[in-house]
Amino acid sequence: MKKLSLYISLLCLILTAGACKNKTGGPATASSELTDDALMDTVQHRTFLYFWEGAEPNSGLAPERYHVDGVYPQNDANVVTSGGSGFGIMAILAGIDRGYVTREEGLARMERIVSFLEKADRFHGAYPHWWYGDTGKVKPFGQKDNGGDLVETAFLMQGLLAVHQYYINGNEKEKALAARIDQIWKDVDWNWYRNGDQNVLYWHWSPTYGWEMDFPIHGYNECMIMYILAAASPTHGVPAAVYHDGWAQNGAIVSPHKVEGIELHLCYQGTEAGPLFWAQYSFLGLDPVGLKDEYCPSYFHEMRNLTLVNRAYCIRNPKHYKGFGPNCWGLTASYSVDGYAAHSPNEQDDKGVISPTAALSSIVYTPEYSMQVMRHLYNICLLYTSPSPRDRSV
């Protein structure tokens, strides 16, 4: 289970919070004195603590944003995120298994989360992107985005399904929690989000604006898990044509090409090679190893190559940013000086922001290269005595 815990905890890494202290809160040790296992355990433990100690108190879910100074100009400290909470749930699950908290403490937290989700706003079974954590009422993500968000729901569901599998054969309280999660899973009406039985899934539906957001989802991007879960639903499963016609665009998703001299097989929406969260989010719950279909001969190798493209671009560093290199690479969605941006390996979308989550969460694809970045960032943290390298991308 340790291997699985490492996979979940590092791949769902949103930030390496508190990495400049050891587990007892004392001064940290230089990374050169730590084994790889010890350094990774430090990162895992502090990642767990972000979601465990930093959770919104009522819901137990992950806050949409974290401000170090505690000042929230938009008065949104209590806003929680559905997709990010799916990642956090998996990090907590790994922490339970590794003994960071007791199994009983972990179960109590999961019960709090599920109790909130059972009562929180849903729209044909799908959750919104944001809620107010104290009330469970939807917090609009945008003017017309005040209803169901099927992509964020999928990210949340893969976390909940991991919890379901963890507890399904446990004691009576654990089995009861698994049964409640099973009902939440069965309540999601994936078919509704076909907007009239079209062979494609739509990102949003609003009780006020209906389908006005008008966002049918095609691959490839971060949304593959949504199509997989929609097809797998035991109650509202979509036909195979939705995957083939919608996600795969009748085969147009296949587009062999090279970027940075590295072969890619898929068509990436709007770019030659997407940000690294496209290689990560869908594969928190879906193992890419051995995964293939008629459009991609190996999803693991495709995502590994997408990661290597990102690294190669950062090393080439065509915009000559200070600090980019073999020990400091990784472009993905995160904050920048101009707000949120989906940083990608091309000159238009490269704003000079290295997000720690990008390379560290790629450790399942590039273990040696990701460890180089982990040690580099850890030592920077010691040098400047900042609380941690951190990123919020959801």
Residue ranges and their predicted role:
Residues 18-19:
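C-terminal motif of bacterial Sec signal peptides marking the signal peptidase cleavage site
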Residues 13-14:
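Sec-dependent, cleavable N-terminal signal peptides
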Residues 28-386, 390-394:
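Ser/Thr/Asn(+Pro)-rich, low-complexity disordered segments
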